[in-house]
Structure formats: structure tokens, C-alpha cells
Amino acid sequence: MAKTVQGFVLIDVDVAALNNAGKDTSTTMDNAVATKKILKGNKWYAYVSGQAWRYWWRDTLKREFNWKLSPIVREKKTAFTQADPVTFPDDDIFGYMRAAKEEITDSKGKKKKQNITLTRVSPLKNSALISVAPTKIEKNWSSMTRHEGDAVPFGKDEYCATMKGMFSIALEQAGTFSSQERTGFKNLNEKLKNLAMDNNAEEMDDPFAMDAKGNPLKLYRLQKKTRLERIRDTVKALEVINGGAMQTNNMADVTPKLIVLTTLNSANHPFSHLAKINAAEKAEFSIPALKQVVQDYSDRIEGRVFIGRRMGFMDELEDDFKEYSTNDKIFYGSINQAIREYIKQMEMQIP
């Protein structure tokens, strides 16, 4: 069975504008920016795109964990990374698509284009971050006045919100590459295969992909030490993840204020509905919903479920979480304690 890290987070921000959508078309003012929001039913919810969350994550890995990020190549109207998951950990964990063709000369001396596209499905998958409760978005009108003459007005959206998100990491996919002629699975070309083997990668049979004769295709797996380091850094980065628009005047802490982590023998994401809106239209974490998920997936959860909460956020949950943690399958502590204890368990689960 496929083992995946499964994570659920709540972040809590005040007077923020974490991900903007460009010019505000609801006003005639030229210098006005709108935040990203989406309509659900007849209510508006502020959100951060999954791409933006990934950008924060990747940038944190570069700055806090010294990841050497894959250089970006720009050609005409396209841009892509080096598509080298052996050398660059972000190409491995975040995936890539490098669509390209090169000119070759065939056996008859004729020149033709050959497809050399490389793609990789990201082992790290994540949702958008979206406010749990409907969001009242305020327009803040400001002006630049530190000059002679008329002031220059500008506007921006701001909001307060508790936002939820979920993510997963495929433990067996991280650091493991295929060369199957299929979109998302053509991870390596011959040069990269050789590079992987030069780095002591293991060549192994693909349990799912076969050639026309029924023979298994090959996978190339990096050493366990390398794979473990990349996965561990990715999870641990949540302790210090930072980012978001308008940070100069609207600084916000985007680290989790509540987190749930476990390893699941499935690629399913079971934690999507752990947060809900209460009668006062405020965000609320549902312990009964968590208990139901843990019970329903008890045959697929490997090891314990780790819960972390930052003191000062949803303090009303403290007693219930402590009581729940008397269950041997549940760990409860601070955010960083939960992340670090989960990593200890995960290290034993990586193939």
C-alpha cells in the first residue's frame, strides 16, 4: 500500500491580505488591489491559492534549510526548472514539467524534432488555504503624502480569518523516479538515469508499469538518507514557514496554529472537514469529526495521530484534546512538539 503523510492545518491572521488578485475592478480608483476571494453559496471566503502556499513552502526550504533550488529557465513564453530531481530537492518534492523538443538527424540524414519532455507528479500535494467562516473583507484607503503636491491615493483589501488547508506527501514517491513514456511519469532521461546511478541510486522493478512484452519497467530510488532528509525538511518547514503579500504593513504569521499529522496507507485526504462554522459564524475545530476519521480509517492509519495546538488559539479545546490523548494512538502537544514527534515516527516508515 502507498504510504502518505497526511496533514491538516489551521492558520489565524488579523488585518492581512495574504494573496492578491490584481486590480480591484469594483472601484474606479486606479491604484486599488483586490485580495483573492471565492463565492460559496452566497458568502465570500478569502483564500490563498495552492500555488502561493507552495511558493512560501519552497522559499522557506531555501532560506531555513539551505535547499539548493533548481534554476529556472525562461524560453519565449514558457518557464521551467532544470527538471533534475537527483541534484535539486525541490524538483524531487515539488515536481516539474519541462516541455521541450530538440533537433536531431535521423538515420537517413534528415533533420527532425524529437520530444525530450520531462515531467514529474509532485509527491507533495496541497490544497488552497481558505477561510473556515465567511470573510468580511474591508477596503483600506490610504495615500502617499510624503511629497509636494496632491496626495496619491491607493486602496487594498484586508481581512481577519482562520484558514484551513491540507497536504500530503507520498513517502514511496519521494526520491524515486520513473522513465515511463507517460505524462507525469517521464521523470528521467538517459543522462539523469546515469546521474542517479552515479549517486548510488537503486535500480528496481516498477510494480505497476510494464513494457509491451509484460516486463516491469525500472524505477530509480535515491539513497534512504537523501530521501529522509528531503521529506523531513519539508514537514519541519511548517514550524517556520513564512510568506504572503503586504507583509511590510500587514505582517502576518502563517505558521500553523493547529495541526494534525499522521501516516495513512492510502492517497486519500481524510481531514478535509475537521473545521466548521459554529452558530455564531466563527471557525471551530470539530473533535468529533476528528474522532470519526480516526475510527473510520483505523485500519489504514499507521502509527499514531499527532495533534499540535498553539496556546492562545482555540484554548477551549485544551481539556478535550488532553482527554483524547489518553488514547495510545493519539499524541497531543504544542505545534513544534507534534511536528517533531511525528517526524520521529515517519523516519521509521520510509521504505
Where are these regions (language model features)?
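RNA-binding basic/glycine-rich loop and surface signature characteristic of RAMP-family CRISPR effectors
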Residues: 1-351
